Swiss-Prot record:
UniProt cross-references to SMART domains, sorted A to Z: IMPDH
Active site, renumbered: C180 (thioimidate intermediate)
Record-given protein name: GMP reductase
HAMAP family from the UniProt entry: GMP_reduct_type2
Species in which this protein is naturally found: Lactobacillus acidophilus (strain ATCC 700396 / NCK56 / N2 / NCFM)
Recorded superkingdom: Bacteria
Signal peptide range: none
Length: 330
C-alpha cells in the first residue's frame, strides 16, 4: 500500500500563497508565457477538451492567438478533416483520442495519410490503465514526433508509469470538475484535494503536468503553477462565452449557455451509467476578455511572487488556512 496518502489533503480554497518582495514596476512587465511541447503559449491555460467548451472555430482562434487548445474526441469522423484544415491554415493541430480498438485504426490512418498532429491527448477518465499504457506505446511508435499527453490520473505511481510508457505529459485530476460527478457516483477521485494531488504528483514527475479540474477563480491558476502544473485545463470558467458551443437560453431576463460534462447524458446521447451532468452557466461575453483577464491576474501573481516570469510562482511559500479563504467574507 502506498504511503503517499499520509500527507495533509487540501484544495484551492484552503491555500494562500505568501508574497515576496516585488522587483517589477508594473504587472505589465511580468511574462506569463509557457513552453509546452515545441511551442510557446501566452498563458498556461487550456480550455477543457469538452464538447461544450471547444469546437473547430474556437480552436482556430486560439491557435491563431498563441493559446494552447485540445480538440475534443466526440466527433471522431471529423478529426482527420480538422487536422487537414488546421495545417492548411498554417496552424498546429491538437486532437484527442480514446482507447477503443477503432482508435488504433485511426492512428494507422494518420500514418497512411502522412498526417502528423503536433499534439495528441489520450482522454480517458481513469488514465492509470493498462489500455492507456498500450495506447501510449502505440502512438509513440507510429507518431514519435507528436507531443503526447495522457490522463487523467491521480497518483505518483500513475505519473511514473505513463511517463515510462512514453507520455510527454500527464493530466492530473479525477472528478474535481464542476460538471463531473465521478466522486459522487463512484466514491473515487480528487474532488476536495485536487491541489494536494497535483503537489504529490509533481514530486515524481520528470515531464510536464496538466492540472485538470477544480478551477473556480483566476487565482487558482497561480496556485496550480505553484504546485507543479505547466498547464491548467479549465472547463466551466471558459464555457458560456460568445464563442463557446452550446445553446443560448434566457431565463427571467438573464442569459445562460449550456455546459455539460464529457460523461453526461447529453454527451453520450442516451442514458447510460453517466459520471457527468448538464448545467447552465452565465453568458460571459467574449472569451477574449476572459483570457485577457486571466493573463492580467497571472501577471499580478508574478509580481506578488517577486519575479518577472511564471516560474517565480513556483518558489513562493504558502499557508494552509484553518478554514477556507472565503470564510472571512461571511
Amino acid at each position: 500500500m502506498s504511503n503517499y496518502f499520509s500527507m495533509e489533503a487540501f484544495d484551492y480554497d484552503d491555500i494562500q500563497l505568501i508574497p515576496n518582495k516585488g522587483i517589477i514596476k508594473s504587472r505589465r512587465d511580468a511574462d506569463t508565457s509557457v513552453k509546452f511541447g515545441n511551442r510557446t503559449f501566452k498563458i498556461p491555460v487550456v480550455p477543457a477538451n469538452m464538447e461544450s467548451v471547444i469546437d473547430d472555430k474556437l480552436a482556430v482562434w486560439l491557435a491563431e492567438n498563441d493559446y494552447y487548445y485540445v480538440m475534443h474526441r466526440f466527433e471522431p469522423e471529423k478529426r482527420i478533416p480538422f487536422i487537414k484544415m488546421m495545417h492548411e491554415k498554417g496552424l498546429f493541430a491538437s486532437i484527442s483520442v480514446g482507447i477503443k480498438d477503432s482508435e488504433y485504426d485511426f492512428i494507422d490512418e494518420l500514418v497512411k495519410q502522412n498526417l502528423k498532429p503536433e499534439y495528441i491527448t489520450i482522454d480517458v477518465a481513469h488514465g492509470h490503465s493498462v489500455y492507456v499504457i498500450k495506447m501510449i506505446k502505440y502512438i509513440k511508435e507510429k507518431l514519435p514526433n507528436s507531443f503526447l499527453t495522457a490522463g487523467n490520473i491521480a497518483t505518483p505511481e500513475a505519473v511514473r508509469e505513463l511517463e515510462n510508457a512514453g507520455a510527454d505529459a500527464t493530466k492530473v485530476g479525477v472528478g474535481p470538475g464542476k460538471a463531473c460527478i465521478t466522486k459522487l457516483k463512484t466514491g473515487f477521485g480528487t474532488g476536495g484535494w485536487q491541489l494536494a494531488a497535483l503537489r504529490m504528483c509533481s514530486k515524481v514527475a520528470s515531464k510536464p503536468l496538466i492540472a485538470d479540474g477544480g478551477i473556480r477563480h483566476n487565482g487558482d491558476i497561480a496556485k496550480s503553477v505553484r504546485f507543479g502544473a505547466s498547464m491548467v485545463m479549465i472547463g466551466s470558467m471558459l464555457a458560456g462565452h460568445e464563442e463557446s458551443p452550446g445553446n443560448v437560453i434566457k431565463i427571467d431576463g438573464k442569459t445562460f449557455k449550456q455546459y455539460w460534462g464529457s460523461a453526461s447524458e447529453v454527451q453520450k446521447g442516451a442514458y447510460k451509467n453517466v459520471e457527468g451532468k448538464q448545467m447552465l452557466v452565465p453568458y460571459r461575453g467574449s472569451i477574449k476578455d476572459t483570457l485577457r483577464e486571466m493573463q492580467e491576474d497571472l501577471q499580478s501573481a508574478i509580481s506578488y511572487a517577486g519575479g518577472r516570469e511564471l516560474n517565480s510562482i513556483k518558489l513562493v511559500d504558502y499557508v494552509i488556512v484553518k478554514d477556507n479563504i472565503f470564510d472571512g467574507d461571511k
